[in-house]
């Protein structure tokens, strides 16, 4: 066998019939950073028929250490990640319908984005977006493959609506906020390990196999790994998959962002962060090399031409831009 997918078809759990199912499948990837590009490349090489990848950001020098689809030329041209990823993925496999979407994923546009999707792969850079996607996935009955990593640590769980707990059910078991890749760093093996778990489950689901409801976590540097059988964590009263209220699709539970008139500043009020631990956050930001000032009411930090002021109630001012998408990107890089 010398065909493009011959070695994959020789793998008995997939075979020629599974390969046909992959060709008919549609994957949507939320985020085109490290996780998104790794998962996208594997899915495209595997022959998944349609791959959409959505991201609001552009390629920077600090991305090249772990975001495998991008080049120095993309940085110099300030290419949007989704556009650069689309071009590269099309060059890898012209048989796949690849669409890169330069957009901020919100409750307002999520249903158009995931229309007709077979699976949704999480590669978002913040937890609020994940909860929006989780609610939409549960509502539409589309499997959602959660994944996150920072430092040498990673975490994955596959949500199968109607069968497994959803992400909302697992909130008490998941780390929300805190360290980010921009404050604690990241090594590429951790990214790839998470993507491996996500794409393996994606291939299983797309070829008709079931996935176990297992919450997987690991720390590669410490050579630690754990698995939690998560079926018992499903809550009948969960507002997302239980009572089907889908709270994160409502306006009241979304991050509010507004451009402040005449100030080149965006105000952001997170729906998740109710009260910030300013002291702990100041320490993280200083460790990341940012210039930080603090008083009992707020902290401020600078990086290049951008300044962020964070108040104890979780409200933030991003100075140096009037672009809401850019301000959100900076906020989630520094705050999580």
UniProtKB/Swiss-Prot annotation:
Cellular-component GO terms for this entry: cytoplasm; cytosol
Name this polypeptide is given: Sulfur carrier protein ThiS adenylyltransferase
Job description of the protein: Catalyzes the adenylation by ATP of the carboxyl group of the C-terminal glycine of sulfur carrier protein ThiS.
Lineage: Bacteria, Bacillati, Bacillota, Bacilli, Bacillales
Similarity section: Belongs to the HesA/MoeB/ThiF family.
PANTHER family, alphabetized: ADENYLYLTRANSFERASE AND SULFURTRANSFERASE MOCS3, UBIQUITIN-ACTIVATING ENZYME E1
Biological processes, Gene Ontology terms: thiamine biosynthetic process; thiamine diphosphate biosynthetic process
Pfam families documented for this protein: ThiF (PF00899)
Gene: thiF
Residue numbers binding ATP: 7, 34, 55, 66, 81, 105, 125-129
GO molecular function: ATP binding; metal ion binding; nucleotidyltransferase activity; sulfotransferase activity; thiosulfate-cyanide sulfurtransferase activity; ubiquitin-like modifier activating enzyme activity
Binding site for Zn(2+): 166, 169, 238, 241
SUPFAM superfamilies, per the entry: Activating enzymes of the ubiquitin-like proteins
Swiss-Prot/TrEMBL catalytic activity: [ThiS sulfur-carrier protein]-C-terminal Gly-Gly + ATP + H(+) = [ThiS sulfur-carrier protein]-C-terminal Gly-Gly-AMP + diphosphate
InterPro entries: ThiF/MoeB/HesA (IPR045886), ThiF_NAD_FAD-bd (IPR000594), Ubiquitin-activating_enz (IPR035985)
EC number(s) recorded for this UniProt protein: 2.7.7.73
Cofactor(s) in the UniProt record: Zn(2+)
Active site residues of this protein: 181
Keywords for the protein's UniProt record, in alphabetical order: ATP-binding, Metal-binding, Nucleotide-binding, Nucleotidyltransferase, Thiamine biosynthesis, Transferase, Zinc
Pathway it works in: Cofactor biosynthesis; thiamine diphosphate biosynthesis
Bound cofactor: record note: Binds 1 zinc ion per subunit.
């Amino acid at each position: 066998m010398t065909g493009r997918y011959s070695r994959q078809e020789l793998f008995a759990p997939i075979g020629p019939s599974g390969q046909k199912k992959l060709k008919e499948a549609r994957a949507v990837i939320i985020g085109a950073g490290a996780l998104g590009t790794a998962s996208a490349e594997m899915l495209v090489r595997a022959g998944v028929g349609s791959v959409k990848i959505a991201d609001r950001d552009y390629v920077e020098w600090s991305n090249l250490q772990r975001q495998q689809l991008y080049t120095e030329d993309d940085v110099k041209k300030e290419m949007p990640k989704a556009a650069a990823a689309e071009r590269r993925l099309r060059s890898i496999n012209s048989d796949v319908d690849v669409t890169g979407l330069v957009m901020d994923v919100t409750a307002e546009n999520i249903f158009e984005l995931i229309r007709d999707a077979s699976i949704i792969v999480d590669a978002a850079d913040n937890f609020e977006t994940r909860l929006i996607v989780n609610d939409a996935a549960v509502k539409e009955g589309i499997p959602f493959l959660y994944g996150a990593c920072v430092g040498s640590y990673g975490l994955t769980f596959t949500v199968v609506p109607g069968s497994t707990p959803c992400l909302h059910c697992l909130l008490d078991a998941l780390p929300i906020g805190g360290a980010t890749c921009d404050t604690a760093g990241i090594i590429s093996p951790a990214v790839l390990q998470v993507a491996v778990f996500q794409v393996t489950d994606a291939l299983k689901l797309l070829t008709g196999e079931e996935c176990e409801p297992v919450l997987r976590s690991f720390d590669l540097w410490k050579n630690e790994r754990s698995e939690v059988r998560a079926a018992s964590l499903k809550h009948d009263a969960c507002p997302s998959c239980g009572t089907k209220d889908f709270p994160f699709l409502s306006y009241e539970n979304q991050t509010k962002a507004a451009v402040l008139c005449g100030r080149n500043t965006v105000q952001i009020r997170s729906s998740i962060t109710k009260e910030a631990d300013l002291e702990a956050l100041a320490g993280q930001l200083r460790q990341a090399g940012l210039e930080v000032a603090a008083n009992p009411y707020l902290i401020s930090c600078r990086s290049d031409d951008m300044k962020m002021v964070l108040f104890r109630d979780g409200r933030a001012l991003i100075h140096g831009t009037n672009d809401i998408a850019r301000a959100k990107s900076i906020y989630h890089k520094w705050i999580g």
